[in-house]
Amino acid sequence: MSKITRRDFINHAGMYTAGGIALSASSLGFRTNQAHAQPMPDWLSLTDEAALEPDLPIIDPHHHLWDRPGNRYMLEDLLLDTSAHNVRQTVFVECTSMYRADGPEELKVVGETEFVQGVAAKSASGGYGETRVATGIVGSADLRLGDRVAAVLEAQIAASPQRFRGIRHRAAWADLSVTPNRAADAPNHILLDPDFRKGYAHLRTHGLTFEAWLYHTHIADLTELANAFPDTTIIFNHLGGPIGIGNYAGRRDEVFAAWKPAVAELAKCPNVVAKVGGIQMVVNGYGWHEMDKPPTSDQLLQTNQDWYHYIIEQFGPERCMFESNFPVDKLSCSYTVLWNQFKKLTVGYS
């Protein structure tokens, strides 16, 4: 593994995602019951850690914002979570938040970008502290529109010319034991769909990247897409979503064994970079949210380090970035604990 300091590694996300530093990406988002569940502050407070290396600058390339009945995660909530660490900038990733109520169906997604642009402007005023939230914005577009998606991409860019960086169109399909709500699922093998690929071709034309959210069973589809479009940057979300529930419950070693060669093959594509994190979700099967108290950073590291080390070895530190995936991963641990884990992981890198 190449040498890299914790400062370089933890602040590395800016090369691909933070507006004003470089670029980012996106895809239509992950929808499970977890994405709509409300984290429990009293439970999270049962595990209290001081932030390690609190002055180390961080760019968080993956979080969401929403205001849903009984489930609110807005600017003030994010800033409270990030306050213990030195989070300098963040990147918002689409989550079907604040879509337009009216107008053409394909353009309703632009409402989300308009909403986040407003949040980013509030943050940029300096009136909410030094953290600059949503310096990069990753939005949605239905790439299955083919050539017609160009108008959607142009509208998204127009809604936030300085911050809009890419598109996320979800490719997370799994069997019914994992995602029983098939209406919320992506079509199976969508990355191979000709109409999707016709729309995907417009990302490069518009200077946008693609953020890929899928499960480990479909990583090969992403590798094929990356090879077919070598000039489009892909950002690989959540380690490829290793599944640990439903028919995959109790099969972690088997999943890991299948995941490793798929990741190794994907890493051969120089146009793909990886987000390291996003595996504290319910779908990953660790059951943290069912414990009497949340995990410590040591517990997280002990459980996750084999996955983290392998993906970093395959992609190299220069093509990896740590992500929080908050508030989705907040069901399992606090922001402070999560980033303490990442800092402990990288101690040997400097």
PLM segments and residue spans:
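H/E-rich (His + Asp/Glu) clusters that bind or coordinate divalent metals
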Residues: 38-44, 243-350
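N-terminal secretory signal peptides
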Residues: 1-8
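Active-site gating/metal-coordination segments in enzymes
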Residues: 39-43, 104-218, 224-227, 240, ...
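An N-terminally biased module of ancient metal coordination in phosphate/nucleic-acid-related enzymes
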Residues: 9-10, 37-129
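Short, well-ordered coil/turn segments that N-cap beta-strands
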Residues: 54-57, 86-89, 130-136, 161-165, ...
